[in-house]
Amino acid sequence: MITSFKLSKQKKITHGFFNRNGGKSDGIYKSLNCGPGSHDKRNKVIENLRIVKNKICKKTKNIVLLHQIHSKKILFIDKNFRFNKKKVKADAIITGQKKIPIAVLTADCVPI
């Protein structure tokens, strides 16, 4: 996990940037592949997401991912947010809620 010196000064947030190293996937996906839309084995993607989630927040079961659609749509997570298995279609996540890890998957894009 790579961290930002400036973001690390913020005591109320935990953050991290992950590269392809340290994952459970094998074959052509041999990496920390967290992309449920890939053709990787589902159980490997779930294990990789668990690795990421545990490094960010061990006290929760889930991590919020988006189905990115290259739009202006933003997901706002508030106290009424409920996890479900269907990914939300949006391109950004904002939350002030504790213990709800959020993630944006990127390939050739730079996360902001």
Locations of regions flagged by a protein language model:
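Active-site microenvironment for binding and transforming phosphate-containing groups
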Residues: 1-112
